Amino acid sequence: MTFTARLPAFLLVFSTFILVGCPGSGDRLQPDELTSVRQVKGDICFSVNKPVDYQPTLIVISTRLAPPQEWVLYENPSVIVTQGELCIPPSFYRFLDNRTYVVRYILQSKKHSDLRRSVVSAIAITNSSVRSVPLREDEAAYY
C-alpha cells in the first residue's frame, strides 16, 4: 500500500488528536468530596479536610429538588476557611427551618491555582438545629 493510499487514514487520526488533544491528568474529573456539618452558635460550619491554603471560589446553595434556576450562587464569597471549617453565618445566607438543603462549594488553592476541590453536603434544618443527611445519587459526582 502506498503512502497516498494511507493518507486519508493518517489525516483522520492526526486531525482527531488536533481537535480533541491528547489525554492527560487534567482530563480526568475528580469526584466530589463529602463533608460533615455542625452548628456553631448561629453559623452552619462545614468541615474542610486538609485545608492547607484552600479558600472557596464558588458556593451554591439550594433546597433539595430545586431546579438550577432557583439555586443561589456566590462567586468569590466573603466567607473563608478558618481552622479547618467553612462557616456560613446568617448574614451570608439564611437557612430556613424544616427544610433540606444541598450545599456545594469549590475550594481553590491560593499557591497552586490549578488545584481545585469540589465539595458537596446535604443538610437538614429542623427546629433550628442542623444535621447531615445522605446525598441522593444525582446530587454528587462519585465516579
Would you name each region that the model predicts?
Residues V48-Y143:
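Acidic, low-complexity Ser/Thr/Gly/Pro-rich repeat segments typical of extracellular/periplasmic
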Residues I18-G21:
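C-terminal motif of bacterial Sec signal peptides marking the signal peptidase cleavage site
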Residues P23-S25:
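Bacterial signal peptide processing site
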Residues L29-P56:
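Contiguous beta-strand segments within globular domains
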Residues M1-L11:
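Bacterial N-terminal signal peptides that target proteins for export
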